[in-house]
From Swiss-Prot:
The gene is RIB3. Keywords: Glutathionylation, Lyase, Magnesium, Manganese, Metal-binding, Riboflavin biosynthesis. Pathway: Cofactor biosynthesis; riboflavin biosynthesis; 2-hydroxy-3-oxobutyl phosphate from D-ribulose 5-phosphate: step 1/1. PANTHER family: 3,4-DIHYDROXY-2-BUTANONE 4-PHOSPHATE SYNTHASE (PTHR21327:SF18), GTP CYCLOHYDROLASE II-RELATED (PTHR21327). This is 3,4-dihydroxy-2-butanone 4-phosphate synthase.
Amino acid sequence: MPSTDSIPKSNFDAIPDVIQAFKNGEFVVVLDDPSRENEADLIIAAESVTTEQMAFMVRHSSGLICAPLTPERTTALDLPQMVTHNADPRGTAYTVSVDAEHPSTTTGISAHDRALACRMLAAPDAQPSHFRRPGHVFPLRAVAGGVRARRGHTEAGVELCRLAGKRPVAVISEIVDDGQEVEGRAVRAAPGMLRGDECVAFARRWGLKVCTIEDMIAHVEKTEGKLETNGSG
């Protein structure tokens, strides 16, 4: 199975370049550890994500649009955990799902509606009453300490927002390989997830910066120091 272990470091972009692209409102591709999920997410800042960018994200990802945000933000927006006892293998902290409570929102599933919900999650004046529950965007509660505390895409999204000076809400979704068409049949052959160098190739195809969470941790530790412990959940 392809993994980041087999990819030369030179194939990845420098973290300052990734941060700058993120600051510019671009997608970045972020890979986690091969011993963890061994997957890559498209990540973008929620505050400026457009309908067109959301459409791209839905097309090239699992379609499950998540919005990592800080613990303080989930509290301020009254976003409790989705379940009392989280059985997710990685402890991904899903809150209740939301749509934007807005005149232009229809069913909540369109690219327009989901982009709007994400922007509203990041809006400085956002209030709990600005959202319908349940909805079609899935906020994720990040742990305090960012990627130094937990090596997940949830924390990577919030960390990128912090490093780029953005509002502390990101938008993420796993990148997939949707397989090949089968002529005359309503199926696709050999679907799966993009992994390892396939993710780098995807980033290059679309002109996106690409990095690993491992490199992000190294950058933050070099510039800001280490935490007492480094989580892996």
